[in-house]
Amino acid sequence: MTNIRKSHPLMKIVNNAFIDLPAPSNISSWWNFGSLLGICLILQILTGLFLAMHYTSDTTTAFSSVTHICRDVNYGWIIRYMHANGASMFFICLYMHVGRGLYYGSYTFLETWNIGVILLLTVMATAFMGYVLPWGQMSFWGATVITNLLSAIPYIGTNLVEWIWGGFSVDKATLTRFFAFHFILPFIIMAIAMVHLLFLHETGSNNPTGISSDVDKIPFHPYYTIKDILGALLLILALMLLVLFAPDLLGDPDNYTPANPLNTPPHIKPEWYFLFAYAILRSIPNKLGGVLALAFSILILALIPLLHTSKQRSMMFRPLSQCLFWALVADLLTLTWIGGQPVEHPYITIGQLASVLYFLLILVLMPTAGTIENKLLKW
């Protein structure tokens, strides 16, 4: 008799994706972030669902409803902080996952990579809209500043912004629609993630060497299921340390002040995970130029497969490319720091230099390094 997990139409899909899946025998902990992202997504959907039961998307009551969740709802405070800090963990895992893809050349799986870029953009949009919902000062002004950037689009800009706002400023209509989108998008993300996985399983996973691992596969279960469980435990440990000991560490104190359209905060800045892009936006004095640089700073990921010049897939055996990769990481950390600083000397200059270096590294230096390494190996 055939095993039910191999014959049942539904169980068969699960079996082929998580149990009998042939996996490379040498994938490191950098390959754990995919499953961690899945856990983050499920966690965010569950905590978000319980928050939505008590939240009201009206400008007069939104701030109070969040306070009510934290003070009056049973364990509301832990649900709220797990959701807020869960977003931070989500982005840490996302950036690690993308970094792994860049380092080991996983972007050569074109469909998987491009769907991943779409996923990144969707998660960023979801997080931005979620930040607006508590209706604190930073929520309101963040929404105003970021949506206002679209007015830089020639001819249709102003109409587009007013259409998104649902009026002539960020108001009740904006908050209501942002709540609606923030609720639906995670389910769309879940669907896209399944397509991401589908395309990955067409080719199989990459591995640190970047060489085909068809000759040496092991079953996903029990080897990588146990490895993923360890990763999940560490993720939950990190999240709960943050939630229980420093819940407001990554937040902005301004968001504990109710939104006031008549009072602009001295430093408007997004959550930490958007600061690198915000720094690139601010480094260009022209509004449209800044918006284009902001968009391109993320969309540049879609160009990465076209910029791959090396005959080797992974950076494992390419020291020159490795140096440039870590320079890129350092540059992104510098941009993150600059994005949180006021617009004054010397931060302006540092931000501009770091922004130029970001694009220079990806578009010029890394492809050049690939070519040089080919020459050195007489390929």
Swiss-Prot record:
SS bond partners: none
This protein's GO CC annotations: membrane; mitochondrial inner membrane; mitochondrial membrane; respiratory chain complex III
GO biological process annotation, one example: respiratory electron transport chain
Topology with respect to the bilayer: Multi-pass membrane protein
Matches recorded under CDD domains: cytochrome_b_C, Cytochrome_b_N
Binding site for heme b b566: H97, H196
Protein name: Cytochrome b
Lineage summary: Eukaryota, Metazoa, Chordata, Craniata, Vertebrata
